[in-house]
Swiss-Prot record:
It is a single-pass membrane protein. Belongs to the UPF0154 family. The keyword Phosphoprotein does not apply. Coiled coil: none annotated. Keywords: Cell membrane, Membrane, Transmembrane, Transmembrane helix. It comes from Levilactobacillus brevis (strain ATCC 367 / BCRC 12310 / CIP 105137 / JCM 1170 / LMG 11437 / NCIMB 947 / NCTC 947) (Lactobacillus brevis). This is UPF0154 protein LVIS_1358.
Amino acid sequence: MATWIWILIVIVVGLACAAGGFYGARKYMENYLKDNPPINEDQLRAMMLQMGQKPSQRKLHQMMAAMQQNARKK
């Protein structure tokens, strides 16, 4: 076979692997987030009650904002 055919085959296989990897990782993350959803305000309120703190709406919003800001940094 000609060299250009081998190069074309390698490029096509590389693109197919990249697309398959992308969709596989995407499906994995969708399933992971479905099984382990991010924490919401109700869960945060329950956690604060278990720690013996009285959760005010202001404190809940502060903690949610801090967690979202911390998640963006990573």
